Amino acid sequence: MTVPLHLGVRAHDFGQIPLADLTRKLQQYEFSHIQFAIKKSFPQSASSLSALSPGTATYYGNAFRRAGIQIAVLGCYVNIVAPDPQTEAQALADFKTHLRLARDFGASLVGTETGSVGQGYTTDNFTEEAFQRVIAAVSKMVAEAERFGVTVGIEAGLNHPLHTAPLARRLLDAIPSNNLQIILDCANLMSPDNYLRQDEVVDEAFELLGNRIAVIHLKDFIVQDGKIQMVPVGQGWLKFEPILRYMKYERPHIQGIMESTTEPHLAESVAFLKQVYENV
């Protein structure tokens, strides 16, 4: 019997719509799980991330549970290496709040990228100093996760201090805790310099990160004017065959989360992924 493809989506890719409409749409597209960032989907319920209460978490967690939808990733995408110490401290506090409330949301993994040591893009992100700041911040996050029995999911991001699979492996080796896992987004590993070698880049990620990959983001890209641009799944240049083959045979039942594919393109993108998955 073929292992089914477990597909989900970022809730905020539907925009800011009423909760009942969101759950109805998720059921309509037969998504079994979501990545949920409350500030992006329901900002009125999160005046500040650190002010979230168990009641807020339970309210949304119960609503998704009743609809048969699991929160696979509780999104708290904050800048954990912000240039301003006060901003960095607030980012870590917000993330720790999500770790504390994860179980009330019905989630076990809280996810983020690493951010930027400058305002926006800077080559300073590619320094050893920036990477050491990532280790310092993630160490604090993982210590808190261990207290609450939940997991930190770190995602490599284009032009972030953590932007390659080898750096993600270094992070895992530097923080020897199973409460630290990787959210793998193969599109985020692409750059104008390496996308023509994407088979090699993706194979390296699977080899280096292996069973420390908790969730896989499914996103597509093109290169335009020398820069990576994200496009709906199936409309770009990412080769999904090796990714879906890995999901089907190496990590059966691992959850995939579609990203940067808005509703006008969802049906076509879902059909594309299911077709590729069936054929690999």
Stretch-by-stretch model annotation:
Residues 15-26, 90-99, 198-206:
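Short, acidic/polar
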